[in-house]
Every structure is written in structure tokens, then in C-alpha cells.
């Protein structure tokens, strides 16, 4: 997922004639726009480490079988906690005048994704521990609303209880 890559690395573009002149890009979308606009004139970037580790949980509108479940309405979503990076299309915004959560109807006709919940850390274990905290603190309620939040919470804690550095195998 590109958001995880963006949290782990930035790109530094330096003037080949003067290394004191540079700019840093943290968004892959921004880098693609720069490449489209400037093509071969753009110098090769240097990869700059940002955080040692990052993990993402894709919060989706799904039923218990993890199948898409469109059309629900979000009536409450807890605020992000410290260390949580939340990417959503404005769903978690409060009314600027009343500071009340604004109900949000999930279209879901083409994508069941509600938001990305991300954490960063110095190690894989600290990053997953932070994600466990985020998932434990996250509460979302509404009408005909089903999500994979509990699935993610169970999966992250299973990883923490077993080998967090497990490698895939076909054996």
C-alpha cells in the first residue's frame, strides 16, 4: 500500500549542480505529478528514511463473512487517538459550528473502504502495538453498519501474540 511506503520513506530531489538546493516529497501522488510535469529534467531522488516501520488497517464496510456491505450510515465515530494516522474522505469531520459528528451514508457501490488507519514506530512490534491501541480505542456506530474493525483487532493481536515477524510460507 502506498501510504505505508510514504510513511517509511520520503524522496529528496537535489539540484545536481548545488546539493544545498533540494526539496523533499512525502507523497507518491505528488511525485507522479512532478514526473509527469518535468519528466527527464527531474533529478533522480534520494530515498530518505522517515520511520522504521508502518502498518495499515483498511477499515471496510463488510459483513461477518468479510463481504462488502454497502449502504450503512455512520452516526458516530470516535476521535483519532495520539499516534493514529487516519485517512478518510472527510467522514470523521465534525460540524465546524457545533462540533457534532455529521452522519455519513456509505455509498459502497464500487468500494467498501471507509478509511485507512495507520501507525508508525521504531520496530514492527511497537508499530503493531500502536495499531492494537488504535483499534481498541476505535468505535464506530450507525444504522445497518457492519465493518471489519473487530477482524483487524483480532488479527493484529494474533500477530502480537505469535511471531510478529512471521514470514509467509507455502509449506
Regions found by a protein language model. Give the residues of each.
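ATP-dependent carboxylate activation and anion-phosphoryl transfer catalytic cores
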Residues: 1-171
